[in-house]
Design a protein with these regions (language model features):
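Hydrophobic/aromatic-rich transmembrane helices and adjacent perimembrane loops
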Residues: 149-156, 298-307, 326-376
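Short hydrophobic/aromatic helix or loop-helix immediately within or flanking a transmembrane segment
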Residues: 49-55, 69-92, 281-290
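Membrane-interface micro-motifs in multi-pass membrane enzymes
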Residues: 72, 76, 122-168, 352-364, ...
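Short periplasmic/luminal acceptor-recognition loop of GT-C membrane glycosyltransferases, typified by
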Residues: 423-458
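Membrane-interface alpha helices of multi-pass inner-membrane proteins
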Residues: 178-208, 244
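Transmembrane-helix motifs of polytopic, lipid-linked glycan transferases
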Residues: 25-29, 99-123, 159-163, 312-313
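Membrane-proximal lumenal/periplasmic loop motifs of glycosylation machinery
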Residues: 37-45, 58-81, 94-95
């Protein structure tokens, strides 16, 4: 290195730039270190489902598969591309998760660098990228940095905008590099459309509108702007591309692959509570935190205030020069995305959560960076210095998330259960979704979990009752052979359809709120669930016009007997009555205060035995079996036996 070159690097205005790179490296390293040490404590079923899908894809050499029941989207440009590749060489699921997270965050930061370079503000990249490398909000750290659910969405937005602004900056000149970039943008749009509606609503449709309105304005004024027309041409092609991807998704992919259909779109009346929810969701995504006036909360909300100041200045100081058209496009894109998302939530879809708006909120980072760097004002150094101070305040607030999270542990009981299953060579488990795939990840795939939508729907005699959501399709075809563990939370036990079977044995493991019951096979569990030891004759007050004698119940003419007020899950049942004079009886099941529940079909009946079948569609409380003597003589009831048949 020459002396002159070295002096240039150490030039006064380069020192802050170099320090900003040090800050970015520190922020990125801190995040990856935190994730490597603590991610196991924050796992949930959704996170583990994504890793399980990647493991399946690693053996099929593809990016999508028919072996999987997808949730609401078939995500093409998603984390499985890299994560499944890592599974080919690494057995530890934890190592795969940490490496995949590190790679995807690095790719997201690189996409942001590409955007900054296309906007010609790359010197601001390291400082503002540090914001993206640290927890902006609870939603961002949970669903982006740790969960990675929507991290690819941000990456796609940044890459696409970088390609778009490169296209805008070439002034109609064509070369191979620029043409390749333009084609790449159209391919990204098409692949994004293959993933469903989300990216279209959040990003592509708002961007198309931003490019469409200037052309319409020129048309109405009778003028023509070549720049507007060229950008609109780009918008038309990319929007056609994304629509082609969506059409292929709706009419082909959603038919070939199992995925939840969006069949709940309706026009709805205005509801101010929905508007309140979305405003609060937006604020939360900016980092606002409720709670006591403690150090971490104060720092987070100071950071939130800093973001508000930066956003307000940026949105009200859009560069006005003609060559700064990209500033207006980027700013209006953010505003249009927020407005469109809010309108959809108000009048069409309301099953939303705070994290759905996060990708739109993240657009504020390039918007603020670009507008502050390019806005025309006299005291530029003062504004720049103030902006840097505000950024540091936000960074200080972001770091406190790690301070708050360092002692939290949400998966301790799951880790204990996972260790128990491994030590006892139990390869399969039954649970609801939220207690399912997380066990598979914690055992490095050694325990295969079958999960249902709710504890009430756990029908172990019918595999099709399993939820077709984020698990292998083969699960819905047959139950496994070998030892199985039923894993349920304390709040689920009273409502599970397996309650009868579980009440007959002590739990094999209790880990905080998780209960584990081990059975030698699925058949053993089915048999335990099927046979009910009814105490039908437990109380004489449930006998009208009759009497008890030595454990036998007698009914006079028009007398009736009922009991035992038990809870039964939905399903089919067979009731067998033994005694004398049963030719003259009738039978009816009821629930709660004699409420009619189900017709009973007579299978067979003679003087000594009567067999009936009936079913409950749903879980039923306080079920009673009413037996009525319809004859003229006395009826003797010796026993009443109940078996669940399906």
């Amino acid at each position: 290195m020459s002396k002159e070159h070295g002096q240039k690097i150490l030039r006064k205005d380069n020192i802050p730039y170099l320090l900003s790179w040090v800050l970015l490296i520190f922020a990125y390293t801190l995040t990856i270190f935190f994730i490597s040490r603590k991610i196991t404590c924050f796992l949930d079923a959704d996170m583990s489902s994504e890793l399980l899908l990647a493991k399946i894809l690693s053996g099929s050499n593809g990016i999508i598969t028919t072996r999987w029941d997808y949730s609401s989207e078939i995500r093409i440009l998603y984390i499985q591309i890299i994560t499944s590749f890592l599974f080919r060489f690494i057995k530890s699921w934890h190592t795969v998760r940490v490496l995949s997270t590190a790679i995807h965050i690095a790719i997201m930061l690189f996409s942001y660098y590409c955007l900054c370079r296309s906007l010609k503000i790359e010197r601001a990249f390291p400082l503002t990228a540090s914001i993206l490398a640290l927890p902006i909000s609870y939603e961002y750290i949970t669903y982006y940095l740790m969960g990675m659910y929507y991290l690819p969405f941000i990456t796609v937005m940044f890459f696409f905008l970088a390609l778009f602004f490169d296209y805008c900056g070439r002034d109609g000149k064509r070369d191979k590099k620029k043409t390749a970039g333009e084609i790449t943008a159209y391919v990204i749009a098409f692949l994004s459309g293959l993933g469903g509606y989300r990216m279209i609503l959040l990003f592509f449709f708002p961007l198309f509108l931003i490019l469409f309105f200037p052309v319409m304005r020129d048309l109405l004024k009778g003028g023509e702007d070549k720049g507007h027309l060229r950008r609109f041409r780009f918008g038309v092609i990319f929007f056609i591309s994304v629509l082609c991807g969506l059409i292929l998704y709706v009419f082909v992919l959603s038919k070939v692959f199992t995925v939840q259909q969006f069949d709940h779109f309706f026009f709805m009346p205005f509801d101010s509570s929905v508007l309140d929810f979305n405003i609060n969701a937006f604020i939360d995504n900016l980092g606002y935190t409720t709670g006591p006036l403690m150090f971490s909360g104060i720092m987070k909300n100071i950071g939130f205030g800093a973001v508000i100041c930066l956003a307000a200045f940026s949105l009200f100081n859009i560069p006005k020069k003609e060559e700064r058209e990209e500033s207006r496009i980027l700013t209006y894109l953010f505003i249009c995305s927020v407005c469109l998302f809010t309108l959809v939530q108000l009048f069409i879809v309301r099953d939303t959560v705070e994290r759905y708006i996060s990708p739109v909120v993240i657009l504020l980072v390039p918007v603020c960076t670009n507008n502050i760097c390019k806005a025309e004002y006299k005291r530029k150094r003062i504004i720049a210095a103030a902006s840097v101070v505000l950024v540091f305040l936000k960074l200080a607030g972001e770091v406190t998330f790690y301070r708050d999270y360092k002692d939290l542990d949400f998966t301790g009981p799951y880790r204990e259960v996972a260790l128990y299953l491994q030590e006892n060579d139990i390869g399969y488990g039954y649970s609801t979704f939220w207690n399912g795939n997380i066990i598979t990840e914690l055992t490095d795939g050694e325990v295969e979990m079958y999960h249902w939508e709710s504890p009430e729907s756990m029908d172990v005699s019918d595999p099709s009752s399993l939820r077709d959501w984020l698990q292998e399709k083969s699960h819905l075809e047959a139950f496994p052979e070998g030892k199985i563990a039923v894993i349920l939370g304390e709040e689920e036990l009273p409502f599970t359809s397996l309650a009868h079977a579980l009440e007959q044995k002590e739990p094999d493991l209790v880990s905080d709120y998780l209960y584990v019951y081990v059975f030698e096979s699925n058949d053993a569990l089915v048999n335990s669930s099927a046979e009910y030891d009814l105490d039908y004759f437990y109380d004489g007050t449930y006998l009208v016009d009759g009497y008890d004698e030595d454990g036998v119940r007698y009914l006079y003419e028009q007398g009736y007997s009922y009991g035992p007020m038990i809870d039964l899950p939905g399903g089919s049942y067979r009731l067998t009555i033994t005694g004398d004079g049963l030719d003259d009886i009738s039978f009816m099941p009821t629930a709660g205060k004699g409420a009619y529940v189900s017709d009973a079909m007579e299978v067979s009946r003679d003087n000594n035995t009567a067999v009936y079948e009936f079913c409950f569609e749903y879980y039923s409380d306080d079920v009673e079996f009413v037996i009525i003597n319809e004859g003229n003589g006395t009826v003797r009831l010796d026993s009443v036996a109940l078996v669940k048949t399906a």
